Regions:
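Short beta-alpha connecting loops at secondary-structure transitions
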Residues: 75-78, 102-110, 129-132
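Helix C-cap/helix->beta junction micro-motif
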Residues: 45-46, 155, 190
Length: 205
């Protein structure tokens, strides 16, 4: 990051990133302590906009956005259908100082006046606040993680769990991954999916 900024600082408009590395079928990597604070400091100094992709992580880490948990303040945040419990809707939220620039850009869409997803989003957000959804999903995730690890140990299996509790990734550690793939296939045959990132929902218990 620093070397790129140093080399191209006058050509960089924004820094776009997910809050942490969370590919669907690989170990997740959380940011090191101070990572986002450093990104924030440099971007502020160089007048670079920070854009966070919270489509997958939005509301799972904190209802105020994943950035709150990682202690930084992005300029723009992208959110997806999770804000409406699966209804087709997305949102780009940001700081007030960007509104003037946004108003200069023509932007239109077929679904702009589709009231059902908007009503669903309001109802979903209200419900998430009411039930403290983030705490609930983290509780389920931690419970699943501890029980899965305990069960794996009883069979002398090294189960690696990465990511945040509300969306963990499970992987059996072995040299050629053969055991992991057999486990995944067997789970699928029983209608249980561990092929990729395990995203918890408040209805899971």
């Amino acid at each position: 990051f620093d070397s790129v900024i140093s080399k191209f600082e006058n050509e960089i408009a924004c820094f776009i990133s997910s809050p942490f590395h969370h590919p669907t079928s690989e170990d997740n990597v959380l940011p090191k302590k101070g990572y986002w604070e450093h990104i924030q400091k440099v971007c502020n100094e160089k007048n670079i906009i920070i854009i966070v992709d919270d489509v997958r992580t939005g509301f799972r880490i904190d209802l105020a956005g994943s950035n709150k948990a990682f202690n930084f303040s992005p300029d723009l945040v992208c959110l997806g259908k999770a804000i409406a419990n699966g209804y087709p809707i997305s949102a780009l939220v940001g700081k007030n100082y960007l509104k003037e620039s946004a108003n200069k850009v023509y932007f239109s869409g077929t679904q702009f006046f589709n009231s059902a997803p908007m009503a669903a989003a309001i109802a979903t957000i209200n419900e998430l606040k009411k039930i403290d959804a983030t705490s609930l999903m983290n509780h389920h995730g931690n419970d699943l993680k501890s029980k899965m690890i305990s069960m794996a140990k009883s069979y002398d299996i090294d189960l690696k769990v990465t990511g945040v509790p509300s969306m963990p990734y499970f992987r059996i550690e072995n040299k050629d991954q053969e055991l992991h793939f057999k486990w995944v296939d067997n789970c699928l045959s029983k209608a249980v999916s561990y092929t990729h990132l395990r995203a918890h929902e408040t209805c899971h218990n």
